[in-house]
Amino acid sequence: IRDRGKSISYRLVYTGRKDDTSLDASLFSDLDMKAPDVYLGVESSNPTSLTAGIMVAFEQELTENPAHVVLVVDDLTATMSCAIVAKKQGIKVAHLVAGTRSFDMKMPKEVNRMITDGLSDYLFTAGMVANRNLNQTGTESENVYYVGNILIDTIRYNRNRLLKPIWFSVLGLQEGNYLLLTLNRRVLLNNKENLPVSYTHL
């Protein structure tokens, strides 16, 4: 859209707090994005309380700022909560990164994915496997759009804009001589036996 010289009027909603410690102060400018128009300020370590809090706050947001479409991203509790609220208000839902599956219903994110995809009017996928997953659950093909991997797209778009973080020089890191990874899966972090095995394989 940007490359075609067009724009869409939208509001960016962040369900957490403005002073969220997981948000770097320069995150949005680094990614060439506008800062959120509103921070709902919802936080809770309890998934049920978090879901309820986001739903109440987002309902108020949509009441004050009606929308034609609500675009939700990924597979978070916020993704599912906002999709439910939008659908209950008769607003179309678009899901970016739809069709992702682990086929493990013990994972909270898998529940989020299933519910969000089931409610969505437009499903934007990262790959053909995701398309197949949606088709196998009865999603109409005309509602599924393969748009590619937005993470890779974001890296490609920003890679020449961003400076190396200062910790590159502080730690003496050299290109090709380090490995950066994230470990955020409960199955890894909650099992003392799994974590050492992961490090060994790395």
Specify the residue positions occupied by each region the protein language model found.
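Conserved small/polar residues in nucleotide/adenosyl-binding loops
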Residues: 200-202
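A short, Lys/Arg-enriched amphipathic alpha-helix followed by its capping loop at the start of a domain
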Residues: 1-8
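Charged helix-capping and loop-helix junction motifs
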Residues: 107-111, 193-198
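A nucleotide-sugar donor-handling region in carbohydrate enzymes
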Residues: 17-22, 41, 119-194
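Short hydrophobic segments within beta-strands
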Residues: 13-15, 96, 182
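A structural signal for isolated positions on well-ordered beta-strands in alpha/beta enzyme cores
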Residues: 9-11, 94, 122, 145
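Conserved nucleotide-sugar phosphate-binding/catalytic loop shared by glycosyltransferases and other
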Residues: 9-50
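Active-site and donor-binding regions of nucleotide-sugar-utilizing enzymes
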Residues: 1, 27, 39-140
